[in-house]
């Protein structure tokens, strides 16, 4: 699964 901070990189 991707990092928890990566999903807010949009």
UniProtKB/Swiss-Prot annotation:
The keyword GTP-binding does not apply. One of its GO terms (cellular component) is extracellular region. The modification Phenylalanine amide is found at residue 10. GO terms for biological process: neuropeptide signaling pathway. Keywords: Amidation, Neuropeptide, Secreted. Signal peptide: none annotated. Its main location: secreted. It is found in: Secreted. Belongs to the FARP (FMRFamide related peptide) family. This is FMRFamide-3. It comes from Sarcophaga bullata (Grey flesh fly).
